[in-house]
From Swiss-Prot:
Residues 340-559 are annotated as: B. Gene3D superfamilies: 3.30.230.80, 3.40.50.11260, Heat shock protein 90, C-terminal domain, Histidine kinase-like ATPase, C-terminal domain. Belongs to the heat shock protein 90 family. This is Chaperone protein HtpG. It is found in: Cytoplasm.
Amino acid sequence: MAHETMSFQAEVKQLLHLMIHSLYSNKEIFLRELVSNASDAADKLRFEGLADNALYENDPNLRIRIGFDKAARTITIDDNGIGMSRDEAIANLGTIARSGTKEFFTKLSGDQQKDAALIGQFGVGFYSGFIVADKITVETRRAGLPANEAVRWESAGEGDFTIDAIERAQRGTTITLHLREGEDELLSSHRLKSIIQKYSDHIALPILMQKEEWDQEKGEMVLKDEDETVNQASALWTRSKSDITDEQYTQFYQHVAHDHQDPLTWTHNRVEGRSEYTQLLFVPAHAPFDLWNRDYRGGLKLYVKRVFIMDDAEQLLPQYLRFVKGVVDSADLPLNVSREILQESRDVKAIREGVTKRALSMLEELANAEEEAGKEKYKTFWSAFGQVLKEGLGEDHANRERIAKLLRFASTHGDTDAQDVSLADYVSRMKPEQSKIYYVTADTWQAAKNSPHLEVFRKKGVEVLLLTDRVDEWMLSFLHEFDGKPLASVARGDLDLGELNDEEKKAQEQAGEAIKPVVEKMKEALGDKVKEVRVTFRLTDSPSCLVADDNDMSGYLQRMLKAAGQNAPAMQPILEINPEHALVKQLNADSASFGDWCHLLFDQALLAEGGMLDDPASFVKRTNALLLSRAA
């Protein structure tokens, strides 16, 4: 096919500009990204070669070769992986196919190190070559295609690229970087080796370079006619833990997770028995930008007998652990395993159970750490992934107790919104006469902390958990008790503090009798707005509050469902009034303004719990009328 010039997709032009002008101080990443792509090409060949061994073309020894030419001022990255066809070269090098392109650009922070990590995460690492090169030439032939169907792709990174048909005997891809002025320091074996060993030492393929030796006569380093392997070239997880440094684990994590930060913790072990596999699992220090997207692909890299199978084997982890990164290498699964087989395999079920237990053990070690550094790591983990972990209470019945021990909440025990109180902490501080774990749900920490429902608890010195995450109401439908102590909402049902409130109960009953006519008239005045009006002892400073009946949905959950566009069943709350409050004491059931006072007490209670008024204008009008009547 003839020489053809094509234009880059608009997003690629934007990306090229970013690469060239914004990431220069982090230019070493170009080699990391191109080596990573070459490694992926080898993985793809291994995978496709399982079904068609002829793709190896009698050249089964996969490798990456890196070279440089001082005279031509070029660096080459050559692999004998899967290669590309003409259409694949156009698609992979001329467009960004990923749906998250816009998100990529919105996530750029200006922090060069962070932005450099995003490049790999979005699969656009090839373009990082333009940081150091003003022209890139790619020659490639897909395994299985004839030599005359190879292609040359070339671009100066300025908006278009050319495609030519060429002859190429070797399958795979050769990338030639024509260096920009001022980049000659890269034309050195020592410099390139140091970059490879810094970023790509963990790559399982051998990375070859021409040997370089000192020539006494010439007084300089000269290239020899033989290659040497410049990386470890063995799968990290297959090596003994004692032979792997923390730095090597960290580099490997950054490779598999496309993350610039260090992991919080990791675990590495071999499992033998009914299922044989090796697992290397990491907990990241921060959540990926798309963790809550519907199409987020969690899961681990799956290998079978060291042969790469797939990138995101979701079946190996429950959804609530989707943030865990790493590798599972199975000795038992068939090499032709598919996603469908993964869903039905007994071996996979055993691996999933084992991986889940190991991941939870990893979190337990952090959560129970005695030293300050470990505690800080768990706080970091919780702020990033706490809401995701809460999903496990509904998803994983077998491990529900273990997950419950890992939960952290804000509470009235502290003065900040920090979620650092475990259920075990709460139980250890319970009053001797206290039989329940109390909580309140609200939209914000401020709203929860100032909820009128907490007044009697403050008076009695009883701790209350402050739950403000959107997942909390759902979580509570699965978390009914902890350590034999039932969880109870302070805003639901008829409050019973057991022996803690015997005196108040007697006083409440007496006060209730005294204002019984007023309570009955209030119910008439409010009509269908409320299920019931009753006297309460849960208030000490506020005149009124709303509570849900024992089996009804809370107001907070109703608001959440409405915000999510779902139909929330209409619920009638219970209005509780404080007989000791001056506003309640002055209520006169026979006055003309009695109905307005009743509605005001209801509306105030609704606002105090974070609710929305159905008719704000009437509320303002009613309040103004009552204020004027008082002033008069």
